[in-house]
Regions:
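Membrane-water interface of transmembrane alpha-helices
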Residues: 45-64, 135-146
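Short membrane-interface loop/juxtamembrane segments of multi-pass integral membrane proteins
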Residues: 66-83, 156-157
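N-terminal signal-anchor transmembrane alpha helix
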Residues: 34-50
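Juxtamembrane "helix exit" motif at the C-terminal ends of alpha-helical transmembrane segments
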Residues: 94-112
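Alpha-helical transmembrane segments of integral membrane proteins, especially early/N-terminal helices
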Residues: 1-17, 45-56, 86
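Long, highly hydrophobic alpha-helical transmembrane signal-anchor segments
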Residues: 2-38, 111-122
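Alpha-helical transmembrane segments and their immediate juxtamembrane interface regions
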Residues: 111-156
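Select subsegments of transmembrane alpha-helices in polytopic membrane proteins
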Residues: 81-95
Length: 157
């Protein structure tokens, strides 16, 4: 076997061409982290505005914020969607601003630090959303009985 012939075959071969561009992979990872971090607050803001502007008209099992007390009467249903609309809009707006600041900082971080920060942001978002839903449910239970009647007097729409 001729060694010179073998060298001539691999003369134009560049091993580095097979390796991915790490800058491109880091760029894709950063973009995906931004999407994952911003998706929750933007969806929360969108649903909050939708519940304020155009809530579902009747209690149903397919659309709307479903909770046993809120589905008992039309008054409880509209009250629930107004309350949830306000809470989700405010929380969505606040989280959008805060998460945009964090997403802006991803470029200055190392990739693993940015990933850990993104995971922390998503966990905080989920915790705040669950707390907001819990508070809304408690307010609904306090304001309405299980049959959908307002507990504090005779409030009309």
């Amino acid at each position: 076997m001729d060694l010179e012939a073998l060298k001539s075959i691999f003369e134009g071969f560049d091993l580095a061409a097979f390796l991915p561009e790490l800058d491109s992979i880091v760029g894709w990872a950063e973009m995906l982290m931004r999407i994952f971090v911003m998706a929750g607050p933007l969806l929360l803001l969108g649903y909050g505005i939708m519940y304020l502007v155009s809530p579902p008209k009747e209690a149903n099992y397919s659309l709307g914020y479903r909770f046993f007390w809120s589905m008992s009467s039309l008054h409880a249903w509209t009250f629930t969607h107004r309350l949830v609309g306000v809470v989700w809009t405010v929380l969505g707006l606040a989280l959008t601003v805060v998460m945009a600041v964090y997403c802006n900082a991803f470029r200055r971080m190392e990739i693993m630090d940015a990933m850990n920060t993104a995971i922390g942001c998503i966990v905080w978002q989920l915790g705040l959303i669950l707390a907001a839903c819990l508070v809304c449910n408690i307010v609904i239970v306090i304001c309405f009985d299980r049959h959908g009647f307002f507990r504090f007097g005779d409030e009309e729409e």
